Design a protein with these regions (language model features):
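Nucleotide/phosphate-binding catalytic cleft detector across ATP-hydrolyzing
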Residues: 1-17, 23-208, 225-226, 236, ...
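Short beta-strand scaffold segments in enzyme catalytic cores
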Residues: 20-25, 216-220
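Glycine-rich beta-strand-to-loop/alpha-helix junction loops that act as flexible
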Residues: 81-86, 323-333
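Hydrophobic, well-ordered secondary-structure elements that form the walls
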Residues: 308, 327, 375
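A general structural motif
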Residues: 300-309
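Short glycine/threonine-rich loop-to-helix capping motif typified by GTGT followed
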Residues: 198-200, 330-344
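Conserved structured catalytic cores and adjacent interaction surfaces
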Residues: 205-207, 219, 224-227, 231, ...
Length: 411
């Protein structure tokens, strides 16, 4: 087997509130991505998706990366890192320019996107992504690839995502402290959408709900493009905390109980099935009905799903997501959650498992790895885009140019 070279390796680094996951993918000759290494380590230095302790975060990243390197038999030099947290903001914008030579060139696309990004954002926020939704040429709508088309006026509709400068700088700082470079920083639900959604769903209209430990991340797609993103600061950690308080058990045992026995719909939990609950201090463990646990878990998940529904309504896209809801993320793997979500949303709901990769498929087909696999796929698409831009000459701004603002004067 040929030795893996740095050139055909991609690494996704999902720095989450409850765990750090590193996934190594090798780009194969047939342009598929084979997952060759996975590393995971509990995360201690983040709260609600934001770094609060650099040393702890660095330690978690190092352990996850070392495990992935060992499995893949390679050395990791750079990563695509995810970003989340309630500091994330998003808005839809548009720009208009005149087409110089009556035919759209890559430079015209760059100018119209620059025009679309010319909106006032707070000084403590930086643009993370400018995601084109569609282009219009002389009022002709629905154009995805304008280069080469004729016209005199070019418009762009874009979705802009911004994040706190300090939050992004701290992620970069933690990764660099591990001796690694950051290829790009990607919004986590955008990454997850690459691995769990189909093109048909994005065309028809879909709402992705990525339930992690610290945050629940939402992304809405219609007509093949991203239309709305949001972050809700309630997720799996709140469920764990509810279990710990209600059952009077230490947090680490509450997390284990949630993973093994939790059910999000009380009517699906048997009243006859008992579970053992460790007590605080040196008190003896107790036995409780699994039904009792479900009575603790269901209200929190119902509250979370109601907040997602309220956000979807506020965005104005609730009636446009004909394909329904896709749940993913580590805290979506709870029995009865899909059924509860169908009751709340009154639309089809499915669990999103990572796809579009080969290799360690049995391991990665788990919602826990949705963001990690998505970061690989985003990285690959991005790399292909840069090759295309290099061929076109004057293309859109490179990732490095786009990210320079994060680094300058900060280290």
């Amino acid at each position: 087997m040929p030795k893996k070279t740095e050139k055909n390796l991609l690494v996704g680094l999902d720095i989450g509130t409850s765990k750090v996951v590193a996934i190594v993918g090798e780009v194969m000759p047939d342009a598929t991505i084979e997952v060759v290494g996975i590393g995971s380590h509990p995360s201690r230095g983040l709260k609600k998706g934001v770094v609060v302790n650099i040393e702890s975060t660095v330690h978690s990243i190092q352990r996850a990366v070392e495990e992935a390197e060992l499995m893949a038999g390679c050395q990791i030099h750079s990563v695509y890192a995810g970003i989340a947290g309630s500091h994330i903001r998003s808005l839809n914008s548009h720009g208009i320019v005149a087409i110089k030579d009556k035919e759209v060139l890559p430079g015209d696309v760059e100018r119209v996107i620059d025009a679309a990004r010319a909106v006032a954002i707070p000084a403590d926020q930086k643009i993370l992504h400018i995601l084109p939704q569609e282009f219009l040429i002389d009022n002709q709508e629905g154009i995805k690839e304008p280069v080469g088309m004729s016209g005199v006026r070019l418009e762009a509709k874009v979705h802009m995502v911004t994040g706190a400068v300090s939050a992004a700088q701290n992620i970069i700082k933690c990764v660099r402290r591990c001796g690694l470079e950051v290829d790009d920083i990607i919004l986590e639900q955008l990454a997850s959408s690459y691995s769990v959604l189909t093109d048909d769903e994005k065309d028809l209209g879909i709402c992705l709900v990525d339930i992690g430990g610290g945050t629940t991340d939402i992304a809405v797609f219609t007509e093949g493009s991203i239309r709305h993103t949001a972050v809700i600061p309630i997720a799996g950690d709140q469920v764990t905390n509810d279990i710990a308080v209600a059952l009077r058990t230490p947090t680490q045992f509450a997390e284990e109980i949630k993973i093994k026995y939790a059910c999000a719909l009380t009517q699906m939990a048997s009243a006859d099935e008992n579970i053992e609950v460790p007590s605080v201090g040196d008190r003896a463990p107790r036995r409780l009905a699994r039904h009792t646990l479900a009575e603790v878990v269901e209200p929190r998940y119902e509250e979370l799903l109601s907040l997602v529904q309220a956000e979807l309504r506020r965005s104005g896209f609730e009636d446009l997501v004909a394909a329904g809801i896709v749940l993913t993320g580590g805290s979506s793997k709870i029995e009865g959650l899909v059924e509860l979500a169908e009751e709340v949303f009154h639309m089809p709901v499915r669990l999103g498992l990572p796809q579009y990769v080969t290799g360690l498929v049995d391991v990665v087909r788990n919602p826990i790895y949705a963001t990690g696999v998505g970061l690989l796929l985003f990285g690959y698409n991005n790399r292909e885009q840069r090759v295309l831009e290099a061929g076109l000459g004057k293309g859109l701004k490179s990732v490095w140019e786009r990210m320079k603002g994060w680094f300058q004067g900060n280290f």
